[in-house]
A protein has these predicted regions:
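N-terminal intrinsically disordered, cationic/polar leader segments
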Residues: 1-14, 21-22
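Conserved residues at beta->alpha junctions
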Residues: 9, 33, 65
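Helical mechanochemical/support elements of P-loop NTPase systems and associated helical scaffolds
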Residues: 10-14, 18, 38-45
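Conserved catalytic network of the ASCE P-loop NTPase/AAA+ motor domain
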Residues: 20-22, 62-63
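Short glycine-rich, basic-tinged beta-strand/loop micro-motifs
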Residues: 22-36
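Short acidic, S/G/P-rich loop/turn micro-motifs used as interaction or catalytic elements
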Residues: 34-39, 77-78
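Residue-level signature of catalytic and energy-coupling elements of molecular machines
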Residues: 49
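Helix-rich interaction surfaces within compact, conserved domain-sized segments
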Residues: 52-95
């Protein structure tokens, strides 16, 4: 089955662990509240995550809430459902 990790991203030092999980074929739900007030660090984290997940790995990023993302490895897809449900977003929408 699919392993789904829960994580709180406090700063950029947590990004490599997220990428490792995705490389291993595991998903992650990431809370980013701690970075929301640090715009440059938030943007850097999103850029690194989206470059790896979408471009290098072929996975998907789903925006669950304003400060929460779900990172999916290749072979897993989020689909649009009801308006209140999560849906796939372009990485430029995360900025």
């Amino acid at each position: 089955g699919l392993v789904i990790h829960r994580a709180i991203l406090h700063d950029l030092t947590g990004v490599p662990q997220l990428l490792d999980w995705l490389s291993d074929g595991e998903a992650a739900i990431v809370r980013m509240e701690k970075l929301m007030t640090r715009e440059l660090e938030l943007q850097t984290a999103i850029d690194r995550i989206s470059a790896f997940v979408e471009s290098d790995l072929g996975g998907q990023i789903i925006r669950l809430t304003e400060s929460r993302l779900m990172l999916l490895p290749p072979g897993c897809r989020g689909v649009r459902g009801l308006d209140a449900e999560a849906f796939s977003v372009d990485s430029s929408d995360l900025r």
